[in-house]
Amino acid sequence: MAKEKKRGFFSWLGFGQKEQTPEKETEVQNEQPVVEEIVQAQEPVKASEQAVEEQPQAHTEAEAETFAADVVEVTEQVAESEKAQPEAEVVAQPEPVVEETPEPVAIEREELPLPEDVNAEAVSPEEWQAEAETVEIVEAAEEEAAKEEITDEELETALAAEAAEEAVMVVPPAEEEQPVEEIAQEQEKPTKEGFFARLKRSLLKTKENLGSGFISLFRGKKIDDDLFEELEEQLLIADVGVETTRKIITNLTEGASRKQLRDAEALYGLLKEEMGEILAKVDEPLNVEGKAPFVILMVGVNGVGKTTTIGKLARQFEQQGKSVMLAAGDTFRAAAVEQLQVWGQRNNIPVIAQHTGADSASVIFDAIQAAKARNIDVLIADTAGRLQNKSHLMEELKKIVRVMKKLDVEAPHEVMLTIDASTGQNAVSQAKLFHEAVGLTGITLTKLDGTAKGGVIFSVADQFGIPIRYIGVGERIEDLRPFKADDFIEALFARED
């Protein structure tokens, strides 16, 4: 009855609850921001607390129904209930204990519970599950943070690796430039020994069949017919040619009997002299003095290196202090005009050219007129590559020569045939037919460094007697050198001890 008197009449009728309800609603509204910040794992705890708050309300309704009949006694105690109403309100307010709920929430949000505290406190299963889920979420967040840190480290490692690779990629060019500079310094030295060493390296493949390759053939043998047969076979393998080989063998046989040679190694020296005499007949450098302009007409088959040889010759003449002009007479091959123009741009040399497909004779005619007007020292005219067995193309070449003679009776002052040394005995056929068509006055032998068929130079020199002006032993401009028979023979027969 004491509890019933304390609650009062208005509380049984629900007046006290109406006054408490706004207060609870305001408190709940104030707690909503706090509750929204709580982790999802704490929702079961909130549900249990709400259930505890709803129990007093249900109990109050049951008691109200039980004492509804005793209205008379309640009316007599109105005065007492009015006095007790403030106390009831005071007592009813702390029952939900709403203010105490944020304290553990705030503690859990600011500081995570330690495992020792969890074990020491008696926690309900729902709270234990909520805390376990909270710990799992925190651990997952820490793992993600750790992964992010590892990712940053991996990124730094990757950046360092890329920087190292870039450093590695930058280093080799610097290492490669040093040998190039050293080679350039060696080339600048006009000493005979420097070029001789380079010539020996370029003739390594040819020396396998000629020159020093004969040492093993002659060593420890007697001079007899078997030795000459082996020598003849070796000369034919080196593309010296049948006629030139027979001539060499005949002269060696006569010389050996005349000098009464018995040692095969002595025959090796005699062979060197014999082959040196063949090349000495064609050792005649090109002289461009006395003519203005000195016109050089370049002829040859396709792909032997005419245009490249023109660019190298132009550079060498310019280094000698002569003014040079180029004529792009190869109007048939695609990009031939552009190729010659590139050589002109590299060396600051003027190039006379027309569109592709134009008449080659007209281009060269215009070039001769321009060279005379500008007082050019040397004019080098390019022509389209043509096979020696194409009669109509050879007739076109004759037409070019006739057109040139209209401006200068002595032009062209040099008709230079470019021969690829790797073609072997086909070079003999080229020299024969081009010589019959336009009358060759010089020969340039290219690509000697990449073939074992360099013996063709002896066949061409022996059969035609046309001066060999230049030999190409490499790709650089300096690798196109004036031909010197003595240097060539010495490099060919140099012994590798």
From Swiss-Prot:
Keywords (A to Z) from UniProt: Cell inner membrane, Cell membrane, Cytoplasm, GTP-binding, Hydrolase, Membrane, Nucleotide-binding, Receptor
Organism in which the protein naturally occurs: Escherichia coli (strain K12)
A molecular function GO annotation: signal recognition particle binding
Record's GO cellular component terms: cytoplasmic side of plasma membrane; cytosol; plasma membrane
Residues noted as binding GTP in the record, renumbered to the chain: 300-307, 382-386, 446-449
Membrane-related topology note: Peripheral membrane protein
Gene: ftsY
Catalytic activity from the UniProt record: GTP + H2O = GDP + phosphate + H(+)
Main subcellular localisation: membrane
Region annotated Disordered, chain positions: 1-63, 79-130
Entry remark concerning the domains of this protein: Contains an acidic N-terminal A domain, a central N domain and a C-terminal GTPase G domain that can bind and hydrolyze GTP. Contains at least two lipid-binding sites. The first site contains the first 14 amino acids (helix 1) and the second binding site is an amphipathic alpha-helix located at the interface between the A- and the N-domain (helix 2).
Keyword presence, Cell inner membrane: yes
Regulation: Conformation of the Ffh-FtsY complex and regulation of its GTPase activity are modulated by the 4.5S RNA. Formation of the FfH-FtsY complex leads to a mutual stimulation of both GTPases.
Biased composition (Low complexity): 87-96
Disrupted-gene phenotype: Deletion affects both cell morphology and protein export. Mutants are defective in the insertion into the cytoplasmic membrane of three topologically distinct membrane proteins, MalF, AcrB and FtsQ.
Protein name: Signal recognition particle receptor FtsY
Domain of life: Bacteria
